[in-house]
């Protein structure tokens, strides 16, 4: 079975149910408004910012940046897999079939959870009903109450929405932009594609000496 998304593309019409379920999962993962991932991601960034310290501001900035990266690579997966031109030279497009019910039914349940659990349980986990946790989480007496600035409330949903057309343009409509960027920054590309060479370093320090 093919696992390289570079050898896929243009298959959404062949597996429409899988495509729709993947879209729902991606929207939830990236923190699209009112889906399950939106409430947790937004709360983490808000709490970090409202810490009011250098570390808190730094953590919020990192959270926003990682939200951007998550959205880009998640939509890259969608567009490279389901859109664009079919690139698999081993298997014909006609051979691709929808997943069986034994896979679709659990996926549908997960998709339903991604849609409704955030709305249903947000008050229990991060809202006014946090008494659900009883004595497992203890708070000191509240002396002041802060509100997150408006820009912080809208920046994550804005990133999620804006990166969808950007990712489509970069990974489907005009892939040449990224290919040219790779050619011009080959050293950086190799450094990143090799995961900062951590695996090589790990093998050199820990694995090779004990062989």
Predicted feature residues:
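Acidic glycine-/aspartate-rich tracts in secreted/extracellular proteins
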Residues: 27, 85-88
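Residue-level signal for the membrane-embedded core of alpha-helical transmembrane segments
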Residues: 69-76
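Membrane-spanning helices that line or support transport/gating and their immediate boundary helices
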Residues: 77-81
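Membrane-interface segments at transmembrane helix junctions and kinks
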Residues: 7-20, 39-66, 88-211
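Transmembrane alpha-helix interface/packing and boundary motifs in multi-pass membrane proteins
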Residues: 25-34
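Residue-level hotspots within pore-lining transmembrane alpha-helices
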Residues: 28, 66-69
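Alpha-helical multi-pass transmembrane bundles of energy-transducing inner-membrane proteins
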Residues: 1-5
């Amino acid at each position: 079975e093919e696992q390289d998304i570079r050898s896929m593309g243009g298959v959404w019409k062949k597996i429409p149910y899988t495509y729709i379920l993947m879209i729902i999962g991606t929207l939830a993962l990236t923190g699209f408004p009112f889906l399950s991932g939106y409430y947790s991601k937004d709360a983490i960034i808000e709490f970090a910012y409202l810490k009011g310290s250098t570390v808190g501001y730094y953590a919020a900035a990192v959270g926003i940046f990682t939200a951007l990266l998550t959205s880009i690579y998640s939509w890259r997966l969608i567009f490279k897999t389901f859109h664009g031109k079919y690139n698999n030279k081993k298997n014909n497009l006609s051979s691709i079939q929808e997943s069986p019910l034994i896979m679709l039914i659990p996926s549908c349940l997960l998709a339903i959870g991604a849609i409704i659990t955030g709305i249903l349980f947000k008050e229990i986990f991060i809202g006014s009903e946090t008494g659900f946790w009883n004595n497992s989480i203890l708070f000191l007496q509240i002396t002041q109450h802060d509100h997150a600035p408006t820009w912080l409330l809208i920046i994550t949903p804005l990133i999620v929405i804006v990166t969808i057309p950007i990712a489509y343009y970069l990974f489907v409509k005009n892939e040449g932009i990224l290919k040219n960027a790779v050619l011009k920054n080959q050293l950086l590309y190799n450094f990143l594609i090799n995961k900062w060479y951590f695996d090589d370093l790990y093998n050199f320090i820990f694995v090779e000496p004990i062989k």
